[in-house]
């Protein structure tokens, strides 16, 4: 890596494709004496990421470009709006990087993962956020399959769980906190 911004997400995604491998993270330029079987280097360059990989038989490069949305309103943003915009931009960057890395890892290994490139988040939580944003189940399914590369089976499971959670929570003021205990 050339920075630590998305280290955990990238590490977990590589670990999912190579569960038996010993994975090391480095922020130093390698001197060519690296003994790793497979080497990835992620570099951020303005609005894009460059992912370089090298193994015994193959060397290549792929890139992930972040396309910034443009606002027709040139009014200055408030501090809160700036923080929200920065948080949204960071999420978009992470999503694009993980998508591109997942596609590369799929190409290198021939494997796919049922939960796609989702690491570090409960898929049902993601589906719940989309439900609360007013999306239909079919729109959520399409978003999860296209953006996060989740399998149709796992997409259906996440949406089912999110709808059940929403039904359970509909009469609870969960935005101000709640406790839920499962007793068997």
Features from the language model and the residues they span:
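Glycine-centered flexibility motif
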Residues: 1-4, 116, 120, 134, ...
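A short, structured N-terminal alpha-helical element that caps or precedes a catalytic domain
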Residues: 1-107, 111-114
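A short N-terminal interaction module
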Residues: 92-159
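N-terminal pre-triad scaffold of radical SAM enzymes
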Residues: 121-128, 164-184
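Short, charge-rich amphipathic segments
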Residues: 4-12, 45-47, 79, 136-151, ...
């Amino acid at each position: 890596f050339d920075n630590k911004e998305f280290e955990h997400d990238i590490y977990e995604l590589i670990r999912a494709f190579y569960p038996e491998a010993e994975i090391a993270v480095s922020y130093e330029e390698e001197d060519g004496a690296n003994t790793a079987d497979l080497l990835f280097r992620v570099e951020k360059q303005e609005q894009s990421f460059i992912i370089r990989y090298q193994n015994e038989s193959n060397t290549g490069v792929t890139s992930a470009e972040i396309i910034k949305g443009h606002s027709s309103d040139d009014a200055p943003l408030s501090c809160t709006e700036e923080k929200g915009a920065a948080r949204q931009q960071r999420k978009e960057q992470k999503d694009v990087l993980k998508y591109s890395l997942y596609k590369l890892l799929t190409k290198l290994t021939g494997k796919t993962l049922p939960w796609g490139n989702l690491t570090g988040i409960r898929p049902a939580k993601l589906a719940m956020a989309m439900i609360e944003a007013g999306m239909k189940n079919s729109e959520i399914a399409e978003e999860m399959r296209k953006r996060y590369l989740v399998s149709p089976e796992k997409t259906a499971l996440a949406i089912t769980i999110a709808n059940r959670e929403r039904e359970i929570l509909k009469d609870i003021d969960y935005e101000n906190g709640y406790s839920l205990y499962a007793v068997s």
